């Protein structure tokens, strides 16, 4: 019995120290598997205003993290994860926005982060062009069937 109580106590302590559970999703706006130029996600440029991006670009996807507590350290940690996800998708930068959800504030998780993954036109390779063309053709077919 004593061993079971200690085990339950340890489980409660471990669970209390676990990371924040968030709700994430990714909405593709272009093909997967684009060429990766940024291998160190810490060097991923982060913009908050479109006017700050000084070269032609297109969004390749949007990544959202919902139900975050209003805690700077947790938000910074999630931004690091967003940058890693953007680099893995072939993005050259992200446009990051933060939203406050009054309804979710009652549960203590009012923050949503939304990041557009940006691909610079100058960074598109020939292989990327083929993937973009194929993606566009598939989108036409999908839209024709709806």
What is each stretch, according to the model?
Residues 131-146:
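Short, cationic low-complexity segments
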Residues 72-73, 102-131:
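Short acidic, glycine/proline-enriched helix-loop-strand junctions
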Residues 27-48:
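Post-signal peptide N-terminal segment of mature Sec-exported envelope proteins
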Residues 14-34:
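Bacterial Sec signal peptide processing site at the extreme N-terminus
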Residues 41, 58-60, 91, 108-112:
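Extracytoplasmic
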Residues 52-53:
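Conserved, non-catalytic sequence blocks in retroelement Pol enzymes and Pol-derived host proteins
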Residues 58-100:
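Short, well-ordered alpha-helical segments
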Residues 1-17:
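Sec-dependent bacterial lipoprotein signal peptides
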